[in-house]
Amino acid sequence: EGLNLLNPSFTEQFLGTADAKRYQLSFAPLDDTAVTAELLQSDGSWKALAEGTDFSVDRTAGALTFVTPPGESPLDGQDNLKITAARTVEGYADRVGRCRVGILYGVGGASDRIFLSGNPDYRNRDWYSGYNDPTYWEDSAYSVLGRGDSAIMGYSILAGRLATHKD
């Protein structure tokens, strides 16, 4: 999953090896927020590991180095290391937060996503939320509709399809 426009936290999972101590996250630099790591146990539960005790964080590089390698997964083929960190991107929340128009819409008449537009800084762009999740707005979940000098003014549903109205 991509970064959430509304929340800087993200979680990545890894399939550990017997000797790997350093794990590179997809995003950097990281915020000063505490980084958490969890290690999969043989019973399927997750054991919390502590920053500063079990691992160190290079926030500039977006990498963790473990004192002891997390090792191989106790469950064949299943990721055994879960890391949660945060990376704030200035202006991300405003991309949807400054929108002025929206509608519920989904395929086949389901109302399972929110579509938003009307942000004066992104006049011809519309964003859509995660499936049945109005709290998740992936940073790449948007469409650019037509020319930038023609703003999206609203939405309607016509014959089961989402229509976008521009000025």
Predicted regions and their residues:
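Beta-propeller and closely related beta-pinwheel folds
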Residues: Y92-D167
